[in-house]
């Protein structure tokens, strides 16, 4: 498929498709918009990781889901809480700046000269699609994105973990999913406090009975 075209794969169920038929193709708009948000956030996360951890960071895997994003990177060490906070802060700063997201078709050579990030080991054609977010991020990418970073609204890293030697996985959420995640964490914390309070009360009761 040429860089300027988008291909879609369909699965036909319980229907016979013949020649010369006219069909209407529709997308789930809400699902697509959520994917756009998380995909653009992934680009911001990628560059923020490089800024905080170093240029050795490369993408080793990625999943853009309507409800969350998952990003695997090359990094030999555990990412500290302070580093995660810095990464999260940078992403949210770029969201607040509401940077315009621009796409363009360029030659692979021109894109590389401009410093566009490419996936290691990926095979590209002579013409590539470049997604640019101001001076902050420039990547070769054929995916769908929001028109500006402000549409992401907010960004929160849920956790990171090692999945193999030298590879770490980061899970994060954006937009309304951030509020849902924080509410869930608050409820879990409240339940934990209740359990601890009951344990304390039981110990106090046992102490009184023994005395």
Regions found by a protein language model. Give the residues of each.
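Glycine-rich, small/acidic residue-mixed loop/short-helix segments
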Residues: 15-16, 162
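Short beta-strands and strand-coil junctions in structured, solvent-facing domains, enriched
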Residues: 30-34, 78-80, 178-180
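Generic recognition of stable, solvent-exposed alpha-helical segments in well-folded globular domains
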Residues: 36-40, 44-47, 79-89, 125, ...
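Generic, well-ordered alpha-helical scaffold segments in large soluble proteins
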Residues: 44-52, 86-97, 173, 177
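Terminal appendage regions of diverse proteins
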Residues: 56, 152-154, 158-211
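Non-catalytic interaction/regulatory segments
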Residues: 66, 73-163
């Amino acid at each position: 498929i040429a860089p300027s075209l988008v291909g879609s794969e369909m699965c036909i169920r319980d229907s016979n498709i013949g020649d010369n038929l006219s069909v209407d193709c529709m997308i789930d708009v809400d699902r697509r918009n959520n994917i756009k948000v998380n995909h653009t956030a992934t680009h911001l996360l990628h560059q923020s990781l490089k800024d905080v951890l170093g240029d050795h960071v490369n993408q080793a895997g990625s999943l853009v889901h309507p409800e969350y994003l998952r990003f695997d990177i090359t990094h030999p060490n555990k990412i500290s809480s302070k580093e995660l906070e810095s990464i999260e802060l940078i992403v949210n700063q770029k969201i607040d700046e509401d940077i315009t997201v621009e796409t363009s078709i360029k030659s692979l050579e021109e894109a590389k000269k401009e410093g566009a990030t490419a996936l290691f080991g990926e095979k590209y054609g002579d013409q590539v699609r470049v997604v640019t977010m101001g001076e902050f991020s420039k990547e070769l990418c054929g995916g769908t994105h929001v028109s500006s970073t402000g549409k992401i609204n907010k960004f929160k890293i849920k956790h990171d973990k090692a999945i193999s030697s030298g590879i770490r996985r980061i899970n994060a959420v954006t937009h309304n999913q951030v509020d849902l995640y924080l509410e869930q964490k608050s409820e879990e914390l409240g339940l934990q406090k209740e359990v601890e309070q009951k344990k304390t009360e039981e110990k106090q009761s046992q102490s009184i009975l023994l005395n």
